[in-house]
Amino acid sequence: MRRVTRSQISRRSLLLSPAAALSCSPPKATGFRGYCFVGNQVSRSVAVVDLTKFRVRKQIPLDAAPSAVLPHPKVTKVYVLMPDAGTVAEIDGMSMAVSRRVRAGNQAVAMQMSAGKDALWVLYRDPASLVELPLDSLRPGRRIRLASPPDSFHLTSEGAAGRQAAVASVQHRSLTLVSLTTGATERTISAGAEPSFVIFRKDGRQVLSGSRPERSLNIFDAASGKTVVRLPLPVEPRNFCVSSDGGELFISGPGMDAVVIVFPYSTEIWQTVLAGRAPGVMTLTEAPSYLLVANPETNSLTVLDESQKLVALVQVGEQPSQLILTPDRQYVLVLNEKSGDMAVIRTYSLRVPRLGTMGARFRSAPVFTMIGVGEKPVSAAVVPWV
């Protein structure tokens, strides 16, 4: 063993070392002043999680199983879709109870907030229609009737060329474009392949449709309905997410342990990157720019940086099914369907290396806490206290 001389370790360096360690320590975690409302499918309930204390405040019973939860854009309320009952329920975060409910059909499929954030649009299969629910009244407004049974839909975003909805029908292998201003069907596009999902490009000028049976992404011109390009995919397109500027589309699904990255504006596939075993749902963070990918088969979360390199792995609960970012971007909330809990991950822990891992290619990031929320959580929304 080499002898340590006085010149190598000084009294000054010993005094300064605790200060250096403190300067490198992570900032103290603070809660988010708001609630996370978690829809539980099997237990037919909504769990209200206090994000300042990270515990469930209340379980709100529902009349039917929920499938989606959306936040109100201005106040502490959420909207819960119960598709088999054809009902949308409004839950008030202050009273922690159902404040209003509306039923505009027998069987619903999905719902989305309008670009103006003043109404919900609910897609119904029975009867086949797209129904507007203004938030102020929560009563059925305009009803746009559809010629074929719908399976999914998407609305143009704010700032797009027009206010439209694209509705996909698997049975008829078609995409129907309707005007949200006039309520008229503008055109029906023959998709050729079964449309598994449909989205507008951010400017509203093109419609993108993924087909699981044919493993393809089909891009159509919204104005004419003509096919722009058909892009073959190495996966069945089941999950997707879009960057905030609309310049990147990320697709995952069965067939390959990878995520496909598409450039919608240049209508080309940029690259395919490995993203853990059987990649599922995804979300994006900013500053730093990370792609978070759920891996249900391994009960984990894969984190890729902007150069698509693996930077972290996080072990979460069983079968992670949805990823939600808190509005302050401080936490990632992971819903785990099988284990019935929600993993809370600090985004800071994903970007700051821990001691002893500086030379590692990637690291294992910790879970901040786990919260039991109910049987089969399938959707959630975070709203601040107002």
Each model region followed by its residue ranges:
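N-terminal secretory signal peptides and thylakoid transit peptides that target proteins
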Residues: 1-19
